[in-house]
Amino acid sequence: MQLQYFLLIAAALFCIGVYGLVTSRNAVRVLMSIELMLNAVNLNLMAFSNYLDPQEIKGQMFTIFVITIAAAEAAVGLAIVLAIYRNRDTVDMEQFNLLKW
C-alpha cells in the first residue's frame, strides 16, 4: 500500500482522538482518546519506517517502546481515576480540580 493511505488513516485517528479529548468530560473517555492519539502516532512511525527503509527495524522498535509507555500511562491514569471515583463517586473532569487542595 502507499504511504498516503496510512497517513490519511493516522490523521483521521488523531483527529478523532483530539475531538474526544476536547469534548469529553468523562475521565475514562479522555484516557481512551489519548490512547487513540498515541495509536495514530504509532501508525505514522510504522508507515514512515517502512517507506524510508524497509530493511531497518528502528521504527518498529520505537513503536513497541511507545506502546509500552502508553500501557504504563493507561495503568497509572486508570488508577488515579479509580481512586478519585472511590472518594468522589464521579469520574467527571470538573471534579478533578479538587486535587488542588
From Swiss-Prot:
Keyword Metal-binding: no
Signal peptide bounds: none
Enzyme Commission number(s) from the entry: 7.1.1.-
Membrane topology: Multi-pass membrane protein
GO cellular component: NADH dehydrogenase complex; plasma membrane-derived thylakoid membrane
Transmembrane segments: 3-23, 30-50, 64-84
HAMAP family, sorted: NDH1_NuoK
Pfam families reported for this sequence: Oxidored_q2
Single GO biological process annotation from the record: ATP synthesis coupled electron transport
UniProt subunit comment: NDH-1 can be composed of about 15 different subunits; different subcomplexes with different compositions have been identified which probably have different functions.
Family: Belongs to the complex I subunit 4L family.
NCBIfam families registered for this protein in UniProt: PRK05715.1-2, PRK05715.1-3, PRK05715.1-4, PRK05715.1-5
InterPro entries assigned to the protein according to its UniProt record, in alphabetical order: NADH_UbQ_OxRdtase_chain4L/K (IPR001133), NUOK/Mnh_C1-like (IPR039428)
Name of the protein: NAD(P)H-quinone oxidoreductase subunit 4L
Catalyzed chemical reaction(s): a plastoquinone + NADH + (n+1) H(+)(in) = a plastoquinol + NAD(+) + n H(+)(out); a plastoquinone + NADPH + (n+1) H(+)(in) = a plastoquinol + NADP(+) + n H(+)(out)
Predominant location category: membrane
Localization, UniProt: Cellular thylakoid membrane
Keyword NADP among record annotations: yes
Biological role stated in the UniProt entry: NDH-1 shuttles electrons from an unknown electron donor, via FMN and iron-sulfur (Fe-S) centers, to quinones in the respiratory and/or the photosynthetic chain. The immediate electron acceptor for the enzyme in this species is believed to be plastoquinone. Couples the redox reaction to proton translocation, and thus conserves the redox energy in a proton gradient. Cyanobacterial NDH-1 also plays a role in inorganic carbon-concentration.
Keywords: Membrane, NAD, NADP, Plastoquinone, Quinone, Thylakoid, Translocase, Transmembrane, Transmembrane helix, Transport
GO MF term set: oxidoreductase activity, acting on NAD(P)H, quinone or similar compound as acceptor; quinone binding
Gene: ndhE
